[in-house]
């Protein structure tokens, strides 16, 4: 009897399992600070659902079989498509925008190697029901703080630097349309996504099978755009003119600059992702000197949820996925003698009420200050800004949103409070409201903490 594990599958000894669960814990800490809610979905789904938006490459890797009842079923290859099905199934029971987090195993029948397995753990996070550059930037900031928490604050002696590459499929599709090859966009995107894996020469060879050389050269020149962020944007504007997707990327970068984390991001038009459901911003993250590929990837998907049911209107979403096992493999490359053990503290939830269009940037700066007020320890204040949309939301609806998420504290900042560098803090439990400075508000919120059970 052959008792070894299948190729691409592995056992985890106690030390390995400890590292994995601490990676999950660190990611959970960051996601919880943004008020993401934890969910779960089945490992098995109907094949028709998973294949609907998987794309040709993913379809080849799906574990598919007939169950004992003769049903055509498949093991999930990611957590995003099952999540879209989850939204379509449970939309009436959810409050939007919905912030989801989920960790679990996924399965892909691909060539296994270091950092790439057939069974592996992912930790996903999404914001659904919100289509704005703020939502895109919020997800990218989660990537940054998640990687910072893992590689700077997790293992004693590990100080891994990382870069987050991002792009926008709207920019590429606009360029393809200008070249008159819009109908070949999916074919081109799938090949562009392989440049860093197989090299530009092989990608060029594949593109030349269906596209003229002059056009292929134009495409490759665009995706290899060099320079600073400002120089790249200027070049794109000179090529595409007044373009909505270019403006979106500018706005996202401005938000990241607001948080002072923009230097860890790189506008890289080679990033296109290999899955058919992405429609907007896309990203991958790279840890220097690891040679492991992306450790956190994702993007915006505008049509995925509605594709599961004709009765569901368009629900836009944006999200990402941390590769837990790939991150563990990078940690294994290091020599370390001590794993920091963090105690997950009770969380105090805060919602910044969106009152004034002129104070949007300030609200997000304030949310970051709440989350990071005691950054040397595990985060213990969860905070989010209620998204401002075109129709506007009155205070009553924002309070109902807070109550539905069991958020205890509301923060109100209008022009008067902003000028005085104060805020109104309303405790929904005690039903009292105080005018406080930031430090005073921290004390009020922290003093009200109670022990809280967490999954870890």
Curated annotation (Swiss-Prot):
Subunit composition and interactions: Homodimer.
Protein name: Histidine--tRNA ligase
Short name of one Pfam family: HGTP_anticodon
PANTHER family, per the entry: HISTIDINE--TRNA LIGASE, HISTIDYL-TRNA SYNTHETASE
SUPFAM superfamilies named in the record: Class II aaRS ABD-related, Class II aaRS and biotin synthetases
Protein family: Belongs to the class-II aminoacyl-tRNA synthetase family.
Keyword Cell membrane among UniProt keywords: no
Enzyme type, top EC level: ligase
Entry's localization field: Cytoplasm
Catalytic reactions of this protein: tRNA(His) + L-histidine + ATP = L-histidyl-tRNA(His) + AMP + diphosphate + H(+)
Predominant subcellular localization, coarse grouping: cytoplasm
Top-level taxon in the UniProt lineage: Bacteria
Keywords: Aminoacyl-tRNA synthetase, ATP-binding, Cytoplasm, Ligase, Nucleotide-binding, Protein biosynthesis
Lineage, broadest ranks: Bacteria, Pseudomonadati, Spirochaetota, Spirochaetia, Spirochaetales
GO cellular component: cytoplasm
């Amino acid at each position: 009897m052959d008792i070894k594990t299948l190729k691409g599958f592995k056992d985890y000894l106690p030390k390995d399992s400890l590292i994995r669960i601490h990676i999950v814990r660190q990611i959970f800490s960051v996601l919880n600070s943004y008020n993401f809610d934890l969910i779960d979905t089945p490992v098995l789904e109907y094949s028709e659902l998973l294949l609907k938006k998987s794309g040709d490459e993913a379809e080849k890797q799906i574990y598919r079989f007939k169950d004992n009842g003769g049903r055509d079923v498949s093991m999930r290859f990611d957590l995003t498509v099952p999540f879209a099905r989850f939204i379509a199934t449970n939309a009436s029971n959810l409050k939007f925008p919905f912030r989801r987090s989920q960790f679990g195993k996924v399965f892909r029948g691909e060539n296994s190697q270091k950092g790439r397995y057939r069974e592996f753990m992912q930790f996903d996070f999404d914001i659904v029901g919100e289509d704005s550059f703020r939502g895109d930037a919020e997800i990218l900031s989660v990537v940054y703080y998640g990687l910072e928490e893992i590689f700077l604050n997790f293992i004693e002696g590990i100080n891994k630097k990382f870069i987050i590459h991002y792009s926008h499929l709207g920019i590429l599709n606009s360029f393809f349309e200008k070249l008159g090859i819009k109908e070949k966009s999916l074919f081109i995107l799938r090949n562009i996504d392989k440049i860093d894996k197989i090299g530009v020469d092989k990608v060029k060879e594949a593109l030349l099978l269906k596209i003229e050389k002059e056009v292929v050269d134009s495409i490759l020149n665009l995706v290899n755009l060099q320079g600073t962020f400002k120089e790249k944007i200027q070049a794109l504007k000179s090529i595409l003119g007044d373009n909505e997707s270019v403006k979106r990327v500018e706005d996202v970068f401005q938000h990241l600059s607001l948080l002072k984390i923009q230097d860890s991001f790189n506008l890289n038009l080679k990033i296109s992702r290999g899955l058919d459901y992405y429609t907007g911003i896309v990203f991958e993250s790279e840890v220097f000197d690891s040679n492991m590929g992306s450790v956190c990837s994702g993007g915006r998907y505008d049509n995925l949820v509605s594709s599961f049911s004709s009765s569901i209107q368009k629900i836009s979403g944006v999200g990402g996925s941390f590769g837990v096992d790939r991150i563990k493999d990078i940690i294994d490359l290091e020599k370390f003698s001590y794993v920091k053990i963090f105690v997950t503290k009770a969380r105090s939830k805060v919602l910044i009420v969106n009152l004034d269009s002129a104070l949007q940037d300030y609200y997000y700066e304030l949310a970051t200050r709440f989350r990071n007020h005691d950054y040397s320890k595990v985060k213990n204040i969860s905070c989010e800004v209620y998204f401002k949309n075109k129709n506007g939301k009155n205070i009553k609806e924002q309070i109902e949103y807070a109550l539905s998420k069991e958020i205890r504290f509301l923060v109100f900042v209008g022009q008067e409070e902003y000028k005085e560098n104060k805020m109104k803090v309303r405790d929904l439990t005690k039903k009292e409201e105080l005018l406080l400075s930031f430090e005073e508000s921290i004390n009020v919120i922290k003093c009200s903490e109670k022990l809280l059970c967490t999954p870890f």
